[in-house]
UniProtKB/Swiss-Prot annotation:
It catalyses: (R)-pantoate + beta-alanine + ATP = (R)-pantothenate + AMP + diphosphate + H(+). Homodimer. This is Pantothenate synthetase. The gene is panC. It is found in: Cytoplasm. InterPro entries: Cyt_trans-like, Pantoate_ligase, Pantoate_ligase_C, Rossmann-like_a/b/a_fold. Belongs to the pantothenate synthetase family. (R)-pantoate binds at Q61, Q155. It comes from Salmonella agona (strain SL483). One of its GO terms (molecular function) is pantoate-beta-alanine ligase activity.
Amino acid sequence: MLIIETLPLLRQHIRRLRQEGKRVALVPTMGNLHDGHMKLVDEAKARADVVIVSIFVNPMQFDRPDDLVRYPRTLQEDCEKLNKRKVDYVFAPAVEEIYPQGLEGQTYVDVPGLSTMLEGASRPGHFRGVSTIVSKLFNLIQPDIACFGEKDFQQLALIRKMVADMSYDIEIVGVPIIRAKDGLALSSRNGYLTAEQRKIAPGLHNVMNSIAEKLIAGNRELQEIIAIAEQELNEKGFRADDIQIRDADTLQELTETSKRAVILAAAWLGQARLIDNQSVTLAQ
C-alpha cells in the first residue's frame, strides 16, 4: 500500500493506472475509520482493480470551527486498517495541498436545492464544502466508481445529482448502513459519546423503527408522528434536532403517489450530533 500526500505524485500514479487500463475505485473519507468505512472498502475492492482511499478532514464542510478542531485525526491507525484490507493507495494530503490559496476566494461547487434543504438548512455551507471536495477528488483521481455510505442519505443524493449535472463518467455506489449489534449506526462521531451515553444512543434507531411501523400501517399524520418521536427522544436523554419524513426518491414532501419514504433523524446526545435514516416502502 502506498501513501500519497502530494498532487504531483498522485497524478503520476493516476496516469500510469490509466495507461494500464485499470478500473479504479475511490472511497472518500475524513479518516477515523470504523467498520462502516471498511464495508465501503470491501465494496470498492469487489468492483475494481485498484482501490484508492482518500483521508482528508475537509475544513470547507465544517459549519462550526470547534467541530473542525476536535474532529479525530488518526492517520496512522487508519493506514494500518487499510493495509490489512489490502488497499492499494491512500491519498492523505495536507490542507495546503488541496487549498493552496486558503479558503478565502476558493472556487466551489454548489448543488442548488439539495445543498440548502433539510440537513443543509441547519448546517449552512456544509454541503457546498462536501460537493467541492468530492468534485476535486473526482478531477484528481478520475475514478470509474466511487463508494459512499447510505448513512449520509442526503449527501449521497447530492453527489448523485452533482455527477449527473456535471456529466462525470463515474458510477456512484451507495453502501447500506452498518450498525452495531444494538442498532446504533456506526459513525466517527460515536467516539464523542461517554459510556453512559453510548448505552442510550441506540434509542435513536428505536424511535425511527417506531416511525417506520406507523408509516407501514398507513398513518400519514406526519406532524403528529414527528412530534411524538421528538418527545420520545427527549425523554430518553437526547436533544431532538431534526426529524423529517420525505419521499425517498426526491427528498421532497411525501405525496399520494410516493412509493418510498425516508425517515431522516438528527439528535444531540452530549457532545455528539447523531444522524440516521431509514427507508420505508409505502402501501399504494
